[in-house]
């Protein structure tokens, strides 16, 4: 009788317990205008077991003079030496302005142009669109996505990036008519505000988007985490330039031209004040300019991964790191990134 009772408990526990979640599939974004995967970058991917690479193929915006829709840049993909065995996911960035005051005819035209570029390099399993749509452009952007569905092969998925504010307020912002979403779990601060703690990612800011968010997002979600840094240059209190990282911090510490302010907490962006004129990122900075450096450390990346446990990710979700740049990823080994993937699924 006791054995039957114990067996009943075990059977009940087995029936009620959730099946283990699938491991996240690791991937990277490649956001350069010339596609080149170095030997070091490929080694990082191989060591991580990464078989997928999201490659930006187009930047699309409006001409400042004519207002016409045109590509800002088109990625040179002639160098395929480091791509063998990788599944390439073409990715298209469009500014929000593209979908302002646009006709259905123009939407269909744009979809056709993009489909033609995307198919130039062979078949693909997915086509990702990156656009921070707003209530005023939502209908046009969603119409565009439906047009893209008609233009690409039926076997290919259509996906779209999801910002944190869109994740938290799907009823207000709408849910894109796509097969999957890529949730961008970064850019949590306002780059125009010099007082922001860390515009790339700060746990307190990210948590605000998670509190009160729906438990179930209407479409399957993949996840993107940051591996990048940037410097925001402020002149007379206003944002002047954004300089992509990594920045030459050691040189800045030793050349005597900068005042380095101490960090207020380990996750806060670092503030630098310029004493003497100098160049940075191809820009001439004047005395009195301020530089706020927002970066991701291993500790901050693990903090993001822990918070990401609260997200409604797909069972077969991908974790894509933004972006593949060995200079900017020097502190992130394959072993560390694998631990990050496992932390999200913990």
Which residues fall in each region the model found?
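Chitinase-like catalytic core of GlcNAc-active glycosidases
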Residues: 21, 28, 59-183
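Glycan-binding loop/region signatures in secreted carbohydrate-active enzymes
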Residues: 234-304
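Structural recognition of alpha->loop->beta junctions
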Residues: 49, 118-127, 171-190, 246-261, ...
